[in-house]
A protein has these predicted regions:
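Short loop/turn motifs that initiate or flank beta-strands
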Residues: 1-192
Length: 193
């Protein structure tokens, strides 16, 4: 009683997902250059431009959700180029992990015949971002007690603590230490001759 004369078919955009990792930089930014696109058909290549934002802020964390406003898909330019209009970032899973930023420390004291490095001897924190400050507790050591510069610190119990920045966003990777020569005063006397 019926015959099929025609039909229509809608082809919807395919949702894509984004993933990436960056080292803590005090910014809640998910830069396109740090993100990888997944979910294209047949491994088609697409480009990504702009910046997204991390919904839970800049701090270190795994699989933080990316707000994709500010990110744009573009046609592929290498491999098997894809057409951006066939795809969408709506409906995909978009996550970025933020890892701790390595920090190095340095300090100095005068010779005291020990190899101890106290937290109070540490005066420089290198590689901290955004004008932040950190503090430190605990103690470490150097290999020899003699005076010298650029000695490698065995970190021991040295631990970063919060300053204006959060210590949890950083990792203590290494340090150098100077032991300065101690001034010695000599006195004496003799009988007039």
């Amino acid at each position: 009683n019926y015959s099929l004369s025609s039909a229509t078919l809608d082809i919807n955009e395919k949702p894509l997902s984004l993933s990436g990792t960056k080292v803590y930089d005090a910014l809640a930014t998910a830069a396109s250059s740090a993100l990888t696109i997944s979910g294209t058909v047949g491994g088609q290549d697409l480009t990504l431009s702009g910046n997204g934002t991390l919904s839970t802020g800049a701090d270190v964390g795994a699989n933080k959700t990316i707000n994709t406003t500010g990110l744009s898909l573009g046609d592929g330019v290498s491999g098997t180029p894809g057409t951006a209009s066939n795809y969408s970032l709506v409906g995909g899973t978009h996550q970025m992990s933020v890892t701790q930023k390595p920090v190095t420390i340095s300090g100095s004291r005068f010779y005291d015949s020990t190899t101890n490095v106290s937290s109070s001897d540490i005066n420089t924190f290198n590689n901290i971002v955004g004008g932040q400050t950190l503090a430190i507790t605990g103690s470490g050591s150097v290999s020899t007690a003699v005076a010298g510069s650029g000695k490698t610190i065995s970190l021991g119990t040295l631990t970063l603590t919060d300053g204006t920045g959060l210590a949890s966003n950083y990792s203590l990777s290494s340090g150098t230490f100077d032991i300065n020569s101690r001034q010695v005063n000599i006195t004496g006397s003799r009988i007039y001759d």
